[in-house]
Amino acid sequence: MFTSVEKKSVTLITLIYFFRMLGAFMVFPVLSVFADSYNMSTPFLIGLTLGIYGLTNAIMQIPFGLLSDYFGRKNIILVGLTIFLLGSFICAITDNIYYLIIGRALQGAGAISGALMALLSDSTSENNRTLSMAIVGVSIGTAFFSAFIIGPVLSKYFELPGLFIFIILLTVLSIILMLSFKNTPAKNTQFNFSVMDLVFDKRLKPHYIDILVLHTVLTSLFIAIPVMMTDVYLISVNEFPQLYSSIFILSLIITLPLLRYDRKNPVLVKNISLIILSFSLIFSFQFYNTNLFIIMIALIFYIGSFSVLEAGIPSSLSKQTNQETRGLTMSIYTSFQFFGTFLGGFIGGYLYDAYGLSGIFFFTAVISVMWLLICLSRNFIGADIVSK
């Protein structure tokens, strides 16, 4: 059972994480459609706009995590939220693709995810830590689902500027919530460990690889999906909320049973999830321009398996860390996550520019199958084997 202090801490952190991830995810289902109308826009620059957030976030996660270990979580999280706010403001007022890229880069530079996860771990006992991580995992899944409904609705009436104004409001609310949080002391004022030791730790490294590939595929895929829906199947952006909500609701058929069984056999669940994800992308490549029904089924299975992997990987990682280096470890993990976002946007934008939608769908199918084969050959998924 949570203590009253733990309940307050978990609630505040969960809300901040939800608002931040909602703001990050809302652009995914619509950016590749609306950014096409910006001055000097090209398919590659659209992909870069989507992915540059991940690059700057990946670069800044480790410094922010290190600083949060040294100066305290609250102070560093507030700095990150302020930087994110500035980037959102630039995105809201521009109609030039290059300034949009700059704004997105600043959004990513406010890299607080690792520090937030470390603060959550600091604020809960060992017995309650897994449950608190699961609560945050649910909030991330809810943010992901909500973003694919709210994003298209807001962009329908206000286009991208209105979307970024809403993100600004969410960020201001997050700052207010963090200001109400009890100040956290520094956990480590002596840097007596090596960053590279944490990066290459054999217990932690599989988690980093998993999240990198997972988000590379996700970002590439969502460069293609909005364009596929509008250009191939002539589905209006106005219909996106109904489309995405149907996909996410039906994906729970996959997600909920797997998450329920995850406590008993996490390794098996991760393997099953990755197999489902790989085959859904193979079918997407095969039928992306010929059969909307099969594409919808494939997306349902993809989102369901993605949600299981997205929740399971950080939960496993948290069991392998200690308090003194937790901020840095979670930030390294988040760096790989967002570097995957950058790679997905960069590679997806290039493939879309050079080969069209088929290039993106082929890439996501191939990389997911390679990931599956590597994991099966090593007999691990997300390093859960290591912790057995």
Describe each region flagged by the PLM.
Residues 1-6, 182-210:
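Juxtamembrane intracellular "pre-TM" segments in multi-pass secondary transporters
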Residues 168-187, 374-378:
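C-terminal membrane-cytosol helix-exit motif in multi-pass small-molecule transporters
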Residues 75-89, 168, 269-283:
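Structural signature of the two symmetry-related core transmembrane helices
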Residues 112-124, 308-321:
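Intracellular juxtamembrane helix-capping segments at the cytosolic ends
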Residues 59-95:
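Conserved MFS/SLC helix-loop-helix module at the cytosolic interface between two early adjacent transmembrane helices
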Residues 268-313:
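C-terminal transmembrane helical hairpin of 12-TM major facilitator-type secondary transporters
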Residues 103-140:
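Cytoplasmic helix-loop-helix junction between adjacent transmembrane helices
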Residues 62-72, 254-266, 352:
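Helix-to-loop junctions at the C-terminal end of transmembrane segments
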